Amino acid sequence: MSNIFSEYRSTPRVKFIPTMLMVAIVAACTAPISKTGRRSETFDAVAATQTFASGFRHISERYIEPVSASELALEGLRGLTTIDPSLQIQHSGNRITIGSDILSPHSYTLPATNDYEGWANLTVQILLDAQNQAAHYQKTKLDKLYEAVFDGSLSHLDAFSRYASVEQAKRNREKRSGFGGIGIRFIMLENGASVSLVFPGSPASNAGLRPKDIITHADGRSLVELKRQETGSLLRGKIGSIVEVKVLRPPARIPFNLSIKRDRIVEITATHSVKNGVVNIHVTRFNNHTAQHVAQNLAQALQEVHRQLNGKAKGVILDLRSNPGGLLKQAVNVSDLFLVNGRIISTRGRHPASNHDYDAKSTDIARGLPLVVLINGRSASASEIVAAALQDHDRAVVIGSTSFGKGTVQTVITLPNKAEITLTWSRFQAPSGYFLHGLGVSPSICATRDKNSDAANVIETALWKAVQHTETVQAWHSVSTKQKRERQRLKEICPATNQLNPIDVKIAERLLKDTALYQRVKALNQAIAFIGK
């Protein structure tokens, strides 16, 4: 599931330590020499201390739950077992003893619980002692030492908090900023990459590439037998660079060459279709242009309806099934396209900067047309923000299965060594007050258990179970974030499915073609409206 995050750059704030440890650090600024006389990679102890202190401080201050510097450092030291599996740490009172098959036992005095610099100094001292004793530690690159410690520190927090090495952090920044590519989607065939979509206005489009063209070579390398990811890597590159491709255009048998200048590619995240006056907007993820893509697709679709039927559209389906999420701002902007006012989402965490309220302040571009949102078990994060906002404000009927329940925000902390920590620091709170994480959004019409039935029966079953639905909504809003088992039990009322069930669309189309039926189902949202007051 995609992470929703904001970026934060740390500024080193390291107070140096008492004289005894200071001497050890200054002496360690040169490469340590082992008993064998071999010199390791240069270990800048001052820089390492700054990096560990910065990491421990920001995790402790910003993580969504309280966590001390001592917990982080001790778990980080245990993370060194990925380098030295025999490592043993014995903790007694204010001292720890560390030893392994290759390290003689050594005892250390522990700093105060939240003395970030003290724990950073201790971590560095232990690493220096290990390097001075064992060639294995000397041979281990500094990046691997950082990774082992921070992976250990973060391992007991949550699944979305993680450390990225200097190189991985660089790739992450490039990914967040966009990438250099040619602007196509493709599938792999026996003879190369078959183009399935050319993005309008992209380098590929400008160069004359068309759907169904087959790219057989990129920069002289055959694409035959390559995996899709390998082919994608060849087509991507630095913005402004040139990729030379060889193209086969069936039914021709002789390929031709194209030189395509890579540019920043922003993936198209919304497409549309129109059927019998019903507009279907399919959103695949939330990137920097998703709200713009949704607005453009809806405008085009409404024009198509007017041309085809010479009248007004019956309604809009917003298909968020299997959408893993993306950017928080874009989730807010997409919600705002269909709302006139009111709260869209709130974020709540321990750190003051993590608390935000996002409100609608636009106009409804669908002009009040009936709206249905489709979700499934792979609809997560930003998708859940949109579904919850439109449901809570009684703007849409939600159909499908319970969503994934990825309701946290991650902040990205850049460390002094240029690595990154992605850290969970707040939770999403829906307009009606419940927290999404570990729970998700509950649909008004659950299609999970009746996927082999017809749309009319599923709708009637939902209306017949209106009282049960109200009870579920009440439980959804009263369950605590600490009650993990109860939250999981509630999710099982409408079990999540990862499939794109055709019946979801059939139910939506039936509702949008019958205004009275749509209003009857929409009345199920009143249970939420009552709780939200």
Where would I find each of the regions flagged by the language model?
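PDZ-domain C-terminal substructure recognizer with occasional recognition of PDZ-binding tails
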Residues: N191-S194, T216, E230-T271, T424-W425
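PDZ domains, with a preference for the canonical peptide-binding region formed by the helix
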Residues: S205, P211-K246, Q330, K406-V412
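Terminal targeting/pro-maturation regions of precursor/exported proteins
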Residues: P12-S161, H477-K533
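Structured segments of extracytoplasmic/periplasmic soluble domains
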Residues: H58-P66, E75, G79-S86, Q125-Y137, ...
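C-terminal "post-core" interaction segments
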Residues: F5, T30-T36, T42-F56, V266-K533
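N-terminal secretory signal peptides that target proteins for export/translocation
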Residues: M1-P12
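Short flexible coil/turn linkers enriched for glycine and charged/polar residues
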Residues: R176-G180, M188-G192, L209-R210, G237-S241, ...
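PDZ/PDZ-like domain segments forming the peptide/carboxylate-binding groove
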Residues: A45, R62, I96, Y108-N121, ...
